Amino acid sequence: MSANTTTVNRFYELFGRQHDLDAVEDCFAPGAIVHFHDMPAMPYMAYKQVGAMYLGAFPDMGVVIEDQFEAGDKVVTRAVWSGTHTGPLMNIPPTGKPILNNELCVDRMAGGKIAERWQISDSLSLMQQLGVIPAPEGM
């Protein structure tokens, strides 16, 4: 396993299993930028705030890496997040419902750290699982 993939896996361990947002910061290069598919690009510190919001909403959050590969200076990871909605998520009160959320991340690495991240999560499915948006009939 390369140093770049090791760093990305460390991120998933620290955030997704240990819930240690302070330690996660070491995985990111100074000035790192994160792109969510449904939000403007943000610096790492704003990303950390989003992470804290999700950990507050899903304190039993866990993650499983399903696929991962490296190409050049990029590490691509497909992961599945799980948890129980026991805290507020934005303006959504706790529902007590379990969730599974698929995610795809492309991390551009520089100096063994994440310099830029493109993160796509299945927000529609998440909202359906929480009962905020109805799921299509028969699903």
Where are these regions (language model features)?
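Exposed beta-sheet edge and beta->alpha loop/turn motif
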Residues: G83-A110
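Short coil/turn motifs at secondary-structure junctions
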Residues: T84, G112, D122-L124
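Low-complexity, intrinsically disordered terminal/linker segments enriched in charged
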Residues: R117-M139
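Short, surface-exposed coil-to-beta transition loops
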Residues: G62-V63, I99-L104, Q119
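Short, low-complexity N-terminal intrinsically disordered segments enriched in polar/charged residues
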Residues: M1-P30, P134-M139
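A solvent-exposed, acidic/Ser-Thr-rich amphipathic alpha-helical stretch
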Residues: A3, L21-V75, V80
